[in-house]
Amino acid sequence: SSMNQNLLDVIVVGAGISGIGAGAHFNTNCPNKSYLIFEGRENFGGTWDLFKYPGIRSDSDMHTLGFSFKPWNHRKSIATGPLIMDYLKETIDEYNLDEKIKYSHHVESANWDESECLWEVKVLNKKTSEKFIYKSKFLYMCAGYYRYSSGHEPDFQGSNDFNGQIVHPQKWPESRNYEDKRVVVIGSGATAATIVPEIAKKAKLVTMLQRSPTYYVSRPDEDKVALFLQKFLPKRFVYKLIRFRNVYLQQLLFKRVRA
């Protein structure tokens, strides 16, 4: 395969929420610096584009999950996956990031060259199979922590003898029909807490299995304080105010439960 060399100031790996945020900051604060965002998949969004399971939504409010520089203007502060994708697309358009994102470009390796004081990054164009070597002063790893090829699947004894369907949320077929069926959800983490209420609307019976007891807090998906303040104050100011409040309350809760 042919190897072409390119020199950049910054290389960003991943066009999910972190990579898009990094690009927006570069365009705003470092407009004269050169950079590219390499995304191995064919679309932006990362987790929010990959996961298609029922009820996919943010686990935290969008005032804290969203960007500090771009207010979240929807009524619901707990957002669905499609709404988050819209938010990210707006950010890409507003900050002209499309020309910076290289889709279907998989980063194969990254090595620090001590002699040149540069990162040497090998990139594969998955569509053409052509390989490139890029060099940069800085490397931003925004690839997240999920393995996109397959999710974690424990080896359950006897699973091969099970006559029903075993579905992993990470590879949930959009055509999956669970109406009037009995469903067992293994685990009680954020994904399970999202899926169970949604499939319970149509399934005959839904049972969640958990190994360790946990606490659930019932919270509204609309922030009434934020909606009230937006009637009198600029939305950008309200967004920053609610963001500060929520971060403070989350830190306070975290410290209390550890006490």
Kindly give the residue locations of the regions a language model identified.
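Beta1-alpha1 glycine-rich phosphate/pyrophosphate-binding loop at the start
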Residues: 8-13, 17-101, 210-211
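Feature captures the FAD/FMN-dependent oxidoreductase FAD-binding
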Residues: 75-147
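Residues that form or immediately flank small-molecule/cofactor binding pockets and catalytic motifs
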Residues: 42, 72, 106, 112, ...
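Rossmann-like dinucleotide-binding core of oxidoreductases
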Residues: 6-7, 11-12, 17, 21-43, ...
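Short, Lys/Arg-enriched N-terminal segments with co-localized hydrophobic residues
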Residues: 1-2
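Structural signal for conserved beta-strand scaffold positions within catalytic alpha/beta enzyme cores
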Residues: 66, 103, 109, 166-169, ...
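Short Asp/Glu-rich motifs
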Residues: 47, 111, 218-219
